[in-house]
């Protein structure tokens, strides 16, 4: 436990998940649920009810889903350049990644299939935030002034990518 570590106790190493390319770093890692859940109850974090699966991403461009019970990878996906951020869509099997390849991608951890790629950045995407799509929009649909709520636009999730060129772009997962 953290308390044991704080008081000088030792942590027990359980496993080493070693599949990213040698010499490259793992940049981001998150717990993820394989089965969507809206049930209330104990959570292991802000995005997952279970602690049996994780997703890692690194500077090798690889995104790897891990089964912690089996101690091995269960699937892999790839960007063309270093992955800078991975964020799980809360309590779902979906996650999004940002990369130096100028793209934001959304994946399904069960199949590791890409279910969406967002373009528009002219440089690397350094950070990413995901939130529930509440239908609030500001931009082209509203003439760039004010915000409005259109309940027909509730799509599930929207996310914001922070680009190295000094711009943040907002996307809706359709």
Residue ranges and their predicted role:
Residues 10, 17-26, 33, 77-83, ...:
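WD40/WD-repeat beta-propeller blade N-cap
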Residues 1-6, 63-67, 104-108, 168-172:
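WD40-repeat beta-propellers
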Residues 57-60, 97-101, 162-165:
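Conserved strand-to-loop turn within each blade of WD40 beta-propeller repeats
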Residues 8-11, 71, 112:
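Short coil/turn linkers that define WD40 beta-propeller blade boundaries
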Residues 37, 62-64, 69-70, 74, ...:
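Eukaryotic modular interaction domains in large regulatory/scaffold proteins
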Residues 29-51, 86-93, 98, 110, ...:
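Loop/turn segments within WD40 beta-propeller blades
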Residues 1-24, 28, 37-43:
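Solenoidal tandem-repeat scaffolds enriched in leucines and small polar residues
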């Amino acid at each position: 436990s953290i308390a044991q570590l704080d008081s000088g106790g030792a942590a027990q190493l359980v496993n080493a998940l070693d599949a990213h390319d040698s010499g490259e770093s793992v940049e981001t890692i998150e717990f993820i649920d394989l089965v969507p859940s809206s049930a209330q109850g104990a959570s292991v974090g802000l995005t997952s009810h279970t602690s049996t699966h994780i997703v890692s991403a690194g500077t090798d461009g690889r995104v790897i889903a891990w089964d912690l019970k089996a101690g091995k990878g269960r699937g892999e996906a790839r960007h063309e350049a270093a992955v800078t951020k991975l964020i799980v869509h809360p309590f779902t099997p979906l996650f999004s990644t940002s990369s130096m390849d100028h793209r934001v991608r959304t994946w399904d951890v069960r199949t590791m299939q890409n279910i969406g790629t967002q373009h528009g950045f002219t440089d690397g995407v350094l950070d990413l935030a995901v939130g529930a799509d509440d239908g609030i929009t500001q931009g082209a649909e509203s003439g760039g002034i004010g915000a409005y709520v259109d309940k027909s636009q509730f799509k599930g999730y929207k996310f914001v990518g922070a680009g190295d060129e000094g711009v943040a772009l907002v996307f809706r997962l359709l």
